[in-house]
Amino acid sequence: MHSGKLRSMASVYLRRDNQLLLLYRQGNSIVSNLWIGSAGGHFEEGEVKDARQCLLRELYEELAISEASLANLSLRYVTMRYADGELRQNYYFFADLIDPEVMTPASTEGITKWFALNGMDGLPMPFTARFMIDHYLRTGQYNDLLYAGIANDSGVQFQSL
């Protein structure tokens, strides 16, 4: 029986020159010592109907980057996974970092590092993020579609919407 508890999260993967900025998150109770998106976190009250608002807040809080420093900000993936007694919904955005003043932004959540698109194999990542990144590198980076992913113990199945 499922309790009906939800955990909604949003994250962004910043892109520049065929690289993605990843964060090695440290000291977090939910996700720690794993490579994740450039910035992200849980929805706060008032953000339940707006994943973009959540993402922009987290981006500014964690990296001090505003929407003005971005181009092509787009929701590309939504995943769902039941884990630890709650339904986890992840909203994954991608954007181009266009501000030339921002090189490798420091994060309040851990260590940031740029990775070549072909250099992320084997990096430890959260379960759905690993499958999402693999799908993005194989398929998603070549189109503008929105994908939904349903996770089970064996992986994540993606479908374009």
PLM regions: where:
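Charged phosphate-binding loop/patch that engages nucleotide di/tri-phosphates or the phosphate backbone
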Residues: 136-161
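Short, solvent-exposed aromatic-acidic interface loops
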Residues: 25-29, 79, 110-111
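Conserved Nudix-box catalytic region and its N-terminal flanking loop in Nudix hydrolases
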Residues: 19-60, 65, 156-161
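Active-site-adjacent beta-strand/loop module that shapes the phosphate/pyrophosphate-binding cleft
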Residues: 18, 78-103, 113, 117, ...
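Short hydrophobic/aromatic beta-strand or adjacent loop that forms the aromatic wall/cage
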Residues: 7-11, 88-92, 130
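Acidic, metal-coordinating catalytic segment for phosphate/diphosphate chemistry
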Residues: 1-11, 16-17, 28
